[in-house]
Amino acid sequence: MNDIDREEPCAAAAVPESMAAHVMGYKWARDKVGQSGCAVYRLHSKSGGSDLFLKHGKDAFADDVTDEMVRLRWLAGHISVPSVVSFVRTPNQAWLLTTAIHGKTAYQVLKSDFGARLVVVDALAAFMRRLHAIPVSECSVQQWTTHAGLPERGSIEAGVVDVDDFDKEREGWTAEQVWEAMHRLLPLAPDPVVTHGDFSLDNLLIVEGKVVGCIDVGRAGIADRYQDLAVLWNCLEEFEPSLQERLVAQYGIADPDRRKLQFHLLLDELF
C-alpha cells in the first residue's frame, strides 16, 4: 500500500483558532487506515518542510485523542514517537497535531519488497524489545487487564464491538463468545511490561531496514508482553506463517506460550 492508497485529498478541516497558524499552507489528505473512530489527516508541506498529522475526535473519541497526547509526551523520553506540535481539548472534542515520522510502514515495506521480510521482522522484534525494556516503575498507565481476571466489559455492553471485523477463525462469533473463550484460558501468569497496545505493521515506521519510530500509541501502557507479540503475530500471518515463529525467536522467546497468544488475540477482537 503506497501513500496514495492510504490517503485521499480533501479540503482543510476546521481547527481551533489557537491551532490555525500551525496548519496554514499545507495540502490536506484524509487518512484511510486505522482511524478507530477519529478523523486523521496528513498535512503535506508545500515548502519542502516536514509533514504533520492531525487527529480529531468527538465525544468518547475525544478521550482517545487525549490519551494519545499524554502517552506521546511520556514515551518521547524513551523511544522515537511523533512530537506533539499542538493539542486542544474542549468538553466534547479534541485535536492533536503531531510531526510525521519519516519512513514507510512495515506493512508497506513487506508489500513492496517481500525479499526484505527477514530484515523487517528482525527489526520489529528488536524495537519491541526496546519498548518492553522501559522500566514499568516509570509508567503510570495501566492497560486493560491483568491475568487475575478479564478486562472491563464496556465495549461489549455498549454494543460497539465490530463483530464483522473478527479474524477468519472467529467469523460468525458474537462478542459474548469471544468473552467466554477468553475466560476459559484463565488464569495466566502476568508478565507486565510497557506495551504499545497496537503493535501492528501499520504503526511501525521503517527506514533502511530499521524501525525509526512508532505511531498510534493511544493504547500504550502496562500490560503483558504477549499483548504486543500477539498483535504482530496476527499481522505476519498474512505474509508467511514462518515469520511468526521468527518474530518470537528474535524477540528472545524459545518456547512461546500459545495460551497467552490466544488470549491476547481474543482480547484484541474486543477493541
Curated annotation (Swiss-Prot):
Enzyme class, broadest EC rank: transferase
Domain of life: Bacteria
Catalyzed reactions: kanamycin A + ATP = kanamycin 3'-phosphate + ADP + H(+)
GO biological process: response to antibiotic
Keywords attached to this entry: Antibiotic resistance, ATP-binding, Kinase, Nucleotide-binding, Plasmid, Transferase
GO molecular function, one term: kanamycin kinase activity
EC number: 2.7.1.95
Pfam families xrefs: APH
Active-site residue numbers: D198 (proton acceptor)
Purpose: Resistance to kanamycin and structurally-related aminoglycosides, including amikacin.
Similarity comment: Belongs to the aminoglycoside phosphotransferase family.
Name the record gives this protein: Aminoglycoside 3'-phosphotransferase
Organism: Escherichia coli
